[in-house]
Swiss-Prot record:
Disulfide bonds: none annotated. Residues 1-27 are annotated as: Disordered. GO terms for biological process: protein catabolic process; proteolysis. Residues 9-24 have a biased composition (Polar residues). Gene3D superfamilies: 3.30.1390.10. This is ATP-dependent Clp protease adapter protein ClpS. Belongs to the ClpS family. Involved in the modulation of the specificity of the ClpAP-mediated ATP-dependent protein degradation. It holds the Pfam family ClpS. SUPFAM superfamilies: ClpS-like. Binds to the N-terminal domain of the chaperone ClpA.
Amino acid sequence: MKLRPLQMSDKTGGTGDDTSILTKTRSKTQRPPLYKVLLLNDDYTPMEFVVHVLERFFGLSHAQAFEIMLTVHKKGLAVVGVFSFEVAETKVAQVMDFARRHQHPLQCTMEKE
């Protein structure tokens, strides 16, 4: 018994001179939208508490946290990070809950990038 490679014409019953090409299109995977997490300034939350929040919930160094805290203080708000929806939502909830438990009016929000 002699084996030979299977050709496209073998499936369709053609003569073997079929020159059609099969193409497979790939749909491009769409990236999920990203969300900015923002801290808003207020006149009551101590600066050191804001620095602590940035270090604890966003993994920033003390120097990075201090810079963002100063931006919030001077400009009224600052972008802390950009995340997927679920991560941004969780970080906002964690910050807001932590601020409330410590009786600070610190506001943290998210918006689509």
